[in-house]
Design a protein with these regions (language model features):
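Conserved ABC ATPase signature
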Residues: 135-139, 143
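Conserved ABC ATPase "signature" region
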Residues: 98, 113-131
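Conserved ABC transporter NBD signature motif
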Residues: 57-65, 74
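Conserved catalytic motifs of ABC-family nucleotide-binding domains
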Residues: 156
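Catalytic Walker B motif of ABC-type/P-loop ATPase nucleotide-binding domains
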Residues: 160-164
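Helix-to-loop junction immediately C-terminal to a conserved catalytic motif
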Residues: 49
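The feature captures the beta-strand-to-loop junction immediately N-terminal to the Walker
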Residues: 34-36
């Protein structure tokens, strides 16, 4: 999936937060946006994953204007790890990660096995496999963030947006 942002501008209460941000990301590319606290990094990501609408400019996914793509379709292609998560689930680490597979869960036993395999591999990739049966609420803040990252990985998105993971 290719992402292109052209001249993104956004203001809050008359204060310009984003001023002409342009960016292109092609398949299999990795980009980092750096800047001091409060410079608009999170706000920019929110425009990409449609929490905030820019005042000016356009965002394209695979050459199509984001506004012309259903929220459901764009959500199927994007996974987000937010700066702060508000998950308050009293369940296991594995259960939280399996939430990333929920849209894909199948009724056939063989396909369920594949969903669990994807979840196990995601947990291994973030170093949380050994804690898969622990309560999510018992984890430290950093461990919770790694679990949320694993959940995003299980979605197998074409675009993964990470806000200070």
């Amino acid at each position: 999936m290719e992402l292109r942002c052209d001249n993104i501008q956004y203001s809050i209460e008359g204060s310009r937060i984003l001023n002409g941000i342009s960016l292109g990301v092609s398949n299999n590319e990795f980009h980092t946006i750096l800047g001091p606290n409060g410079c608009g990094k999170t706000t920019f990501l929110k425009t990409v994953y449609r929490i905030t609408k820019p005042d000016l400019g356009a965002i394209y996914l695979d050459g199509k204007p984001l506004d012309n793509i259903s929220i459901r379709k764009s959500a199927q292609n994007m996974a987000v790890v937010a700066q702060f998560n508000n998950l308050n689930f009293d369940c296991s680490v594995l259960d939280v990660v399996m939430l990333g597979r929920t849209p894909h869960l199948k009724m056939m036993e063989q396909e369920k096995k594949e969903d669990y395999k994807i979840a196990y591999n995601a947990l291994k990739s973030v170093g949380m496999y050994e804690k898969r049966n622990r309560s999510y609420l018992s984890l430290s803040g950093g461990e919770k963030q790694r679990v949320v990252l694993a959940r995003a990985i299980t979605q197998q998105p074409t675009l993964l947006l990470l806000d200070e993971p």
